[in-house]
Amino acid sequence: MILAAALAIVSFAAAFRLYWVFGGNLGYSVSLPQLPDGLPVMAHRLPWWRLAAGGVVICLICLALLLLTRAGHLQLPLSQDLVRFVLLTVGAAFVARAVIPNRYVGFFKGLRTTRWANYDTRLYSPLFLVLGLLTVWQVI
């Protein structure tokens, strides 16, 4: 159940980003943190946006493979200690992203008036928190 929930979140996130890589625009306007005027915080990096989405897809696939390895459904040529370390690190980073106060992201963000902030509070941060906890739980 824990593995299935984690893989469902990872699959959803990877599929959405893959859609962006291949030209999709749904959700694009709320895919990056925004300044009070609505412009993306990293507007100077927008030309790399689709390439970056592809990098995230690769990372999410690796996360899914590590989760499957830890659960015993897949064998990778990696030590169990390394798999555990990576999963704990990623899980802790996801939880931290959701709960550590920051200007643009997380439940305790300082800037709450943008469309991005609304999506982050209601969708992104809860998904990061749940996926982080599920990932850590898969290890312990």
Residue ranges and their predicted role:
Residues 13, 90-97:
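Alpha-helical transmembrane segments of multi-pass membrane proteins
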Residues 83-89, 114-131:
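Individual transmembrane alpha-helices with interfacial aromatic-anchor signatures
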Residues 97-111:
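Transmembrane alpha-helical segments of integral membrane proteins
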Residues 50-67, 124-132:
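Core segments of transmembrane alpha-helices
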Residues 66-86:
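Cytoplasmic juxtamembrane regions at transmembrane-helix boundaries
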Residues 16-54, 73-75, 108-115:
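Interfacial loop at the N-terminal end of multi-pass membrane proteins
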Residues 70, 135-140:
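Juxtamembrane boundary at the C-terminal end of a transmembrane helix
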Residues 3-22:
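N-terminal signal-anchor transmembrane alpha helix
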